[in-house]
C-alpha cells in the first residue's frame, strides 16, 4: 500500500512489484561525525594514527565512557535543512560544567537516533503498525556502540546483516533473480541475506532515553521554531 511518510514526501516504488520504500531523512545525519572529527577530535586522530586505526574506532571506545543520555545533553540534528523543516537549525541544550567533547559526540549519536525515532513513529501512525525490529546498514552500522545506542533509544532489537554495503547486496539480489538463479525475490533474500549481529535494548537505558525523548527532544523544535526562523533570516546575508 502506498503511504507517504510525511506530507509531500513520496514513497518510492520498490524493485519488487506493488511494494514501496518509505524514507525519513536526517539530512547530513552521520556527516556530523565527520564534522566532529574535523573540529574537535584532533587528540583522537593522533591516537588513531599511532595505533593504525580509524579515528571513528577510537571515538567509539570513548563513546562508552559517557552514560546513556549524555548526562542531560540533548542535541537536535539539524546541521543542514530538511524537506519538512527547512528553517530548522542544529541545537544542543543542557550544558553543564561537567560536560566534555565526548559528551557532545555521544549527544550527536543520540540526537540522530532521536530524529530517526521521531520519523519512524510518524510512519507507524500512518500505516497503523508497530515496528518490532530494526535492520541497519551503512557506515554507522559498523559500530557496535552506535547500534546498541540505537536499540536502546528505539526500544526494539537492532540487527545488521553480513555487510554494511546493503545497496550493493540489493543490486546483487536483483541481478541473480533476473538471471533466474532464484525463482523469487523472497528466495534470493533467504539465500543471500544473513543476520550477523542483533543488539537487544537495555531496558534501564531505554527508560532514560524515553524520558529525554518525550520531555526534552520532542519539545525542542516547537519551542525553537520561531528562533530558527530568526536565525535563518539573519543568515541570508551570508548565503
Language-model features: where?
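Glycine/Thr-rich phosphate-binding loops that ligate phosphate moieties of nucleotide
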Residues: 1-239
Amino acid at each position: 500500500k502506498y503511504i507517504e511518510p510525511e506530507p509531500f514526501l513520496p514513497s518510492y516504488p520498490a524493485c519488487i512489484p506493488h511494494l514501496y520504500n518509505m524514507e525519513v531523512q536526517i539530512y547530513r545525519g552521520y556527516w556530523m561525525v565527520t564534522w566532529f572529527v574535523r573540529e574537535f577530535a584532533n587528540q583522537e586522530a593522533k591516537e588513531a594514527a599511532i595505533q593504525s586505526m580509524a579515528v571513528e574506532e577510537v571515538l567509539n571506545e570513548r563513546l562508552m565512557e559517557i552514560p546513556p543520555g549524555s548526562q542531560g545533553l540533548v542535541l537536535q540534528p539539524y546541521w543542514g535543512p530538511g524537506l519538512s523543516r527547512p528553517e530548522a537549525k542544529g541545537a544542543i541544550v543542557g550544558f553543564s560544567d561537567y560536560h566534555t567533547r565526548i559528551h557532545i559526540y555521544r549527544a550527536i549519536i543520540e540526537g540522530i537516533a532521536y530524529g530517526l525515532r521521531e520519523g519512524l513513529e510518524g510512519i507507524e501512525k500512518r500505516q497503523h503498525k508497530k515496528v518490532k525490529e530494526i535492520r541497519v546498514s551503512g557506515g554507522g552500522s559498523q559500530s557496535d556502540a552506535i547500534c546498541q545506542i540505537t536499540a536502546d533509544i528505539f526500544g526494539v532489537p537492532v540487527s545488521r546483516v553480513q555487510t554494511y554495503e546493503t545497496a550493493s547486496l540489493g543490486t546483487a539480489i536483483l541481478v541473480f533473480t533476473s538471471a533466474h538463479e532464484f525463482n523469487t525475490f523472497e528466495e534470493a533474500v533467504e539465500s543471500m541475506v544473513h543476520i550477523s549481529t542483533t543488539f537487544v535494548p537495555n531496558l534501564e537505558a531505554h527508560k532514560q532515553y524515553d524520558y529525554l525523548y518525550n520531555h526534552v527532544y520532542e519539545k525542542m523544535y516547537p519551542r525553537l521554531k520561531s528562533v530558527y526562523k530568526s536565525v535563518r533570516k539573519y543568515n541570508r546575508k551570508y548565503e
